């Protein structure tokens, strides 16, 4: 059995750790609340954009746009969202693990034809370990989501797609569903799949608009806005998922510390009782000698 001094030292150490994890949980919870508020403030605008897009797609005429043209994939770009720091459970590990699966799918293209955009220091480190060179430094976006920076990244990807420098763009991120649930999500960013949008037509009555000067001109303005907003939405989504994962990880760590403290307290009391018993036996034995 461990000595009283050893057990007492372990109790103090676990208690200090519990204070740290509890404080980190409160900080992560506050950041999560802020991230959720940012998403809620942005949702009305995003929903309105998608509503307009759905209305246009309900028309009989086919929409023409270079952003919806599918072509043979010879070069692909993957934007991967993670965090700058750890202590958030399997948040980063799951992203990197799934990224390796995607990279295996595109192995036939060659490493030079798979472009990686890592958003977050942890995934940037993972990309480097996998032998790839990042297309830029986007670490700051993971901590402080900015529409301007997300829009700039979207513009760069749109430009490269239009110039046929890349044939497809994918997004890999954690989708925030609740504090306890974050869903690993893989989406095609470019080309835009309008068939998914057209499914909304059957869900309700679509207003009949007269579009001037033409649907194609309006869509030429609308689709880039949708793409910029999509990038920002995913950035906010990943940020909220990170804070949710860290909140849960710190909650679990705090609960485990509480359980360990209870076990150590029982151990300490048993050790103390054993020490007192031994002293009494020594005293009794000495008096009878």
Curated annotation (Swiss-Prot):
Keywords, comma-separated and alphabetical: ATP synthesis, Cell inner membrane, Cell membrane, CF(1), Hydrogen ion transport, Ion transport, Membrane, Transport
GO MF entry, a single one: ATP binding
GO biological process terms held by the UniProt record: proton motive force-driven plasma membrane ATP synthesis
Signal peptide (from-to): none
Cell membrane is among the record's keywords: yes
Tagged with keyword Cell inner membrane: yes
One Pfam family from the record: ATP-synt
Bilayer topology term: Peripheral membrane protein
Location(s), subcellular: Cell inner membrane
SUPFAM superfamilies named among the record's database cross-references: ATP synthase (F1-ATPase), gamma subunit
PANTHER family membership: ATP SYNTHASE GAMMA CHAIN (PTHR11693), ATP SYNTHASE SUBUNIT GAMMA, MITOCHONDRIAL (PTHR11693:SF22)
General function of this protein: Produces ATP from ADP in the presence of a proton gradient across the membrane. The gamma chain is believed to be important in regulating ATPase activity and the flow of protons through the CF(0) complex.
Protein family membership: Belongs to the ATPase gamma chain family.
The protein, known as: ATP synthase gamma chain
Organism in which the protein naturally occurs: Phocaeicola vulgatus (strain ATCC 8482 / DSM 1447 / JCM 5826 / CCUG 4940 / NBRC 14291 / NCTC 11154) (Bacteroides vulgatus)
Gene name as annotated: atpG
């Amino acid at each position: 059995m461990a000595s009283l001094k050893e057990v007492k030292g372990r109790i103090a150490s676990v208690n200090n750790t519990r204070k740290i994890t509890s404080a980190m949980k409160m900080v992560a919870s506050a950041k999560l609340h802020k991230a959720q508020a940012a998403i809620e403030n942005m949702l009305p605008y995003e929903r309105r954009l998608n509503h307009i897009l759905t209305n246009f797609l309900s028309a009989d005429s086919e929409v023409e746009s270079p952003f919806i043209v599918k072509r043979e994939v010879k070069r692909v770009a993957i934007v991967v969202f993670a965090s700058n720091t750890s202590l958030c459970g399997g948040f980063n590990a799951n992203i990197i693990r799934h990224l390796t699966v995607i990279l295996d799918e595109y192995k036939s293209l060659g490493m030079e034809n798979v472009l990686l955009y890592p958003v977050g220091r942890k995934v940037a480190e993972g990309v480097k370990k996998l032998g790839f060179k990042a297309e830029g430094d986007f670490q700051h976006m993971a901590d402080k989501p900015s529409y301007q920076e997300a829009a700039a990244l979207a513009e760069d990807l749109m430009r490269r797609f239009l110039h046929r420098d890349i044939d497809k763009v994918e997004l890999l991120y954690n989708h925030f569903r609740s504090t306890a649930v974050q869903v690993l999500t893989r989406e095609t960013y470019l080309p835009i799949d309008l068939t998914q949008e057209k499914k909304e037509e059957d869900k309700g009555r679509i207003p009949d608009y007269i579009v001037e000067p033409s649907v194609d001109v309006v869509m030429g303005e609308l689709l880039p806005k949708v793409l910029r907003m999509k990038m920002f939405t995913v950035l906010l989504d990943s940020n909220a998922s990170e804070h949710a994962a860290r909140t849960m990880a710190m909650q679990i760590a705090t609960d485990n510390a509480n359980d360990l403290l209870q076990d150590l307290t029982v151990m300490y009391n048993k050790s103390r009782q054993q020490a007192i018993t031994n002293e009494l036996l020594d005293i009794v034995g000495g008096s009878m000698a």
